[in-house]
Amino acid sequence: MSEFSQTVPELVAWARKNDFSISLPVDRLSFLLAVATLNGERLDGEMSEGELVDAFRHVSDAFEQTSETIGVRANNAINDMVRQRLLNRFTSEQAEGNAIYRLTPLGIGITDYYIRQREFSTLRLSMQLSIVAGELKRAADAAEEGGDEFHWHRNVYAPLKYSVAEIFDSIDLTQRLMDEQQQQVKDDIAQLLNKDWRAAISSCELLLSETSGTLRELQDTLEAAGDKLQANLLRIQDATMTHDDLHFVDRLVFDLQSKLDRIISWGQQSIDLWIGYDRHVHKFIRTAIDMDKNRVFAQRLRQSVQTYFDEPWALSYANADRLLDMRDEEMALRDEEVTGELPPDLEYEEFNEIREQLAAIIEEQLAVYKTRQVPLDLGLVVREYLSQYPRARHFDVARIVIDQAVRLGVAQADFTGLPAKWQPINDYGAKVQAHVIDKY
């Protein structure tokens, strides 16, 4: 977990005293990324000054800068990064002039943000969660065993603080990077739609589906492991309740629980927000197609007519069958009044009237249970009623019986929090889950 032992004034005074500052224009940042990439290919993690100059030359060529002053500008860039604590320089009397350079933690952190952390991997996340699960289980076992203060520090607090918490922070960082990627995808989609939305529809669909899939993979992986992680954290919390001197472990467990809840909650919220954006884009595309199709065609036709003698063309057209939009929100249901007289056998009786009659009959029959204070087993009662009606009416009759039954009273077993058993109510696979009503 990210904790600060110093106060805000102390941190401000410390930064001012050490003259901390970072200034990385795009060319300097590119140079730092190039250094990190080349450094990752070396086993010893060290680079000479000549190798840094070669990396700077590649960046300079990419930015189309002059090559006449490459040596001076490379030296200035290297010195500036050493001053900003992005590179460490090591020199020796035996090899004067041949300094060795290594990336500092700050340099690694910046380059890691731009290079490695932007690559989402479900396998990487699964491995992280697997490591966390193992560490939490061992810590929970050690907490239940108990021991002296050294035991709690070494076997419980240390794994939680320096392994579990850091991996949680890494997962949280992955989520925040996914937030940035979502914003970048939104910007890309906006640019595509502003240029030529007809040609951009397929590209927009690809970007939307890829981002949705990545978010869903991330959330599914988190939810699959979330319950087990929370269970082990609760085991540790239960073990510390009888020890007043373990408040530091209890506070850390609470922080980890909050962090895990926040990670899983934001993952689901991020998916919901993206679904809303996905619908917004599709609605925009549909609206654009409805509003713009004739205007675009007319504009292109006028341009083609004006340039016909320079660029002759032939017009082909097809009259395709109309596509009907069958979405529920746009369907208009017809409910026209029927006039005329019909024979008595064909008289129409609305379902509401039948339902009211059935409800009255069932209510009267079920009232006997309340009068006699007899427990009402909803599964048996519904099954008995359904046996009197054809299969096509089973759903409606079952709903009426249940509505009337729950008005009579409640089941005391509902307050225990235990789920009721499923009971079959007909011979076609229908089941009901309800406790016996015994309090009227």
From Swiss-Prot:
Cytoplasm keyword on record? yes
* Localization: Cytoplasm, Nucleoid
- Keyword entries, A-Z: Calcium, Cell cycle, Cell division, Chromosome partition, Cytoplasm, DNA condensation
Q: Which domain of life is it from?
A: Bacteria
Q: Which CDD domains match?
A: MukF_C (cd16337), MukF_N (cd16335)
Q: Single GO molecular-function term?
A: calcium ion binding
Where mainly located?
cytoplasm
Query: Does the keyword section mention Ligase?
Result: no
Q: Which SUPFAM superfamilies match?
A: MukF C-terminal domain-like, Winged helix' DNA-binding domain
Query: What's an example GO cellular component term for this entry?
Result: nucleoid
Any one Gene Ontology biological process term?
A: chromosome segregation
- According to the UniProt record, where is the region Leucine-zipper? 208-236
What is annotated about its quaternary structure and interactions?
Answer: Interacts, and probably forms a ternary complex, with MukE and MukB via its C-terminal region. The complex formation is stimulated by calcium or magnesium. It is required for an interaction between MukE and MukB.
Please state which protein family the record places this protein in.
Belongs to the MukF family.
Record's function text: Involved in chromosome condensation, segregation and cell cycle progression. May participate in facilitating chromosome segregation by condensation DNA from both sides of a centrally located replisome during cell division. Not required for mini-F plasmid partitioning. Probably acts via its interaction with MukB and MukE. Overexpression results in anucleate cells. It has a calcium binding activity.
- What name does the UniProt record give this protein? Chromosome partition protein MukF
The species this protein was found in: Escherichia coli O157:H7
Taxon lineage: Bacteria, Pseudomonadati, Pseudomonadota, Gammaproteobacteria, Enterobacterales
